[in-house]
From Swiss-Prot:
This is Phosphatidate phosphatase LPIN3. A motif (Nuclear localization signal) lies at residues 135-144. It is found in: Nucleus. Residues 97-232, 270-296, 312-372, 535-567 are annotated as: Disordered. The keyword Protein biosynthesis does not apply. Its EC number is 3.1.3.4. Inhibited by N-ethylmaleimide. Its main location: nucleus. It catalyses: a 1,2-diacyl-sn-glycero-3-phosphate + H2O = a 1,2-diacyl-sn-glycerol + phosphate. Keywords: Fatty acid metabolism, Hydrolase, Lipid metabolism, Nucleus, Phosphoprotein. Magnesium-dependent phosphatidate phosphatase enzyme which catalyzes the conversion of phosphatidic acid to diacylglycerol during triglyceride, phosphatidylcholine and phosphatidylethanolamine biosynthesis therefore regulates fatty acid metabolism. GO terms for biological process: cellular response to insulin stimulus; fatty acid catabolic process; positive regulation of transcription by RNA polymerase II; triglyceride biosynthetic process.
Amino acid sequence: MNYVGQLAETVFGTVKELYRGLNPATLSGGIDVLVVRQRDGSFRCSPFHVRFGKLGVLRSREKVVDIEINGEPVDLHMKLGDSGEAFFVQELDSDEEDVPPRLCTSPIPWGGLSGFPSDSQIGTASEPEGLVITGRRKRRRRRKPRRKEDVVDSSSEELEAGVESELTLLEKPTPESPSAQEEEETSSQPKDIHPYSDGECTPQANLSSGDLMSPKSDSELELRSLEPSPLRAESHMQWVWGRLPKVAKAERPEFSLILESMAEAICALPEEPSPSSSPSEAGVDTLSPPVLHPGVRADKFHPAVEAHCEETAVDSPLAAPESKETKTQNSRGAGHPPATKSWSWTTPESHTPSGHPQVSRGKGSLKRNQHLGPSDIYLDDLPSLDSENVALYFPKSEYGMGARRWSEPSNQKLLESPNLEHIAECTLDSVDKIELSLCGGLADNRDISLEKFTQHMVSYEDLTKNPGLLDDPNLVVKINEKHYNWAVAAPMILSMQAFQKNLPESTVDKLEKEKMPRKGGRWWFSWRRKDFPAEEHSSQREKAATRKQQGEKTEVLSSDDDVPDSPVILEVPPLPSSTPGYVPTYKKSLRLSSDQIRCLNLNEGANDVVFSVTTQYQGTCRCKATIYLWNWDDKVVISDIDGTITKSDALGHILPQLGKDWTHQGITSLYHKIHLNGYKFLYCSARAIGMADLTKGYLQWVSEHGCGLPKGPILLSPSSLFSALHREVIEKKPEVFKVACLSDIQQLFLPQRQPFHAAFGNRPNDVFAYRQVGLPESRIFTVNPRGELIQELIKSHKSTYQRLGEVVELLFPPVVRGPSTDLASPEYSNLSYWRKPLPYVDFEALA
């Protein structure tokens, strides 16, 4: 029994360690890279597929991947994306065509001086030569500790007054002062938020989005409303060989489509309430005034349908309790209703919470579930409401506060005098004035003054006479007291005019980064400078007066001591002269150019490469791979792993990890003999990228009579573990990845010659993939779990790896290196050209 217990403990420990290595939250891996030296001395390479896990604590300034080749660091860095993928950043030329938005990125953060703002805040701008910058030393904010009694009180009263506190927030939505909002923004957001960095947004967008928080990753963007299943989360990320990951459009399940169609059909049917039912139970009759629901746009409002849909949702026998996630989102987002209405089956509450605002009428009062927000309101009740109730039904931003709000001043009219005239006035005046001017100056290092903007103002007559002024580089568009060029302002105006929605903050920031001219001498953090021009002084005075009127306060960082700030003087390197209107654009890339590869100083054959990310909390996370340098005239043999080297697909993953040898007999010696004849081996498997270390360790562990498998690049699927298993086990389509991968490798050698000489597999899918890359059937071999080797040209003939090793010289003749005795034109040799032709023989006459 002791032996059985020890064996069970060993198996359990091995499986536990294996699971830790395959956990999607900690999964990291790198696929080997193949570099091919061309005939002319240039280089081509396969994509650098590297993926890191454990990205929960990474910030923008830490998303830099360092690279070491053969133990030496190289002057080449990668950047991390939202899903953990690493990529290179390349600057586009001005004449290069536009790239898709998902491939655009910010430059790799620059590890600047310690103690100063990070690279993403500084960007790529520099000060002119000889400029002396004076500033204050950076002070660390002292965090106020929370009092212990506050924690005790909040924890003791949380369960008793949880619902009442939320309803109190709904009942009294008093706007906070700007200083309080700034304090909340500062406390709720980290300090190292960088603009234009992947996976993050500005503090304004993060804070003001309410329950519609901006996602940090692409998978989170698509799967926020779905159940957090690892398989479902990974299946919506599309990972393709040679390309960066992107969000795949999730197919809507058939059951949800049926439910939605049933709900629409039920809501469309008219239903007359029974005479005995009260208005609070039967809903609103058809003769009653239209009901205005909070958070719903008036132009998309249908009174009868909305009222009946609510009644159906509450009284339906199919009602089911809400999930905790839904309740949490509804309770948080009650103050800010979402832009779109979603169907949910809820159970009616048996009591009305105290403090819930209700609108009374002669026929009775309307009651709603506490999770459905405030009750409905009639249009003829609007003149009698106070500002607090109006704020519930007319929120400041109906599209989510993450968008840029143009109409903040005009929305205040609803709170001051909520009547129908002001509602119509605010609807028409929902957008501030958009002013045009030909003053220019967007690329200058000082702001545009009001006098200069007004002096070159564009009127309606000017635009009608000369519409071409929109292409004028001096055109400045003023929206919400901010200045933009036409390339940035046009999408903003078009979005508001066509869709009645503002562009998200991240989109506007991206447009500013790509389309706005970079300011010549502006430093991104506000240090003091001397000798301001008069125009700049006036603009600063105007800004200060405006901020004072609006009640904004500049946040003052509390210092550790009372010593006055001492100035810091920096000598900034000179900025190379460039065109003021040019803004560099950066794109993501997985491949290196020939010049970049040449700078790596690769050795012939295998080169060990280490990708590392250093974080503040996790230390250094490393990912290892190998870069193989081959020549354009090498001959390559392709080999599958699961079922070809191992005896079966499923057990080939598990048994080798438990120490069991599960390889075919004779395959190691056969591959070794083929390698001695001058052939290169390429291992191609549909395993996931996270299993790269595990797969490489297994191939190095395989040994037979002291002979191991030849070294070669191990090409795996760049997708996640669950996606790879789903494609290989459930869909049974591993050839989708193999065709794309092998075709890409083939392009590295072409148009010189066909690189592939033979291939080994175990499935018809492998045969299909090998045929797609031009391999003849005479050199395609498949093996079954019994170890029987079949040549696709003669399927009836069965052999083994041992027998094929005996005739390896015939099927895999030695590769001749260097000069050979072959003639350039054999048809002009003495034997072929000077000999007499053979006499014609009539075979029919002989028959």
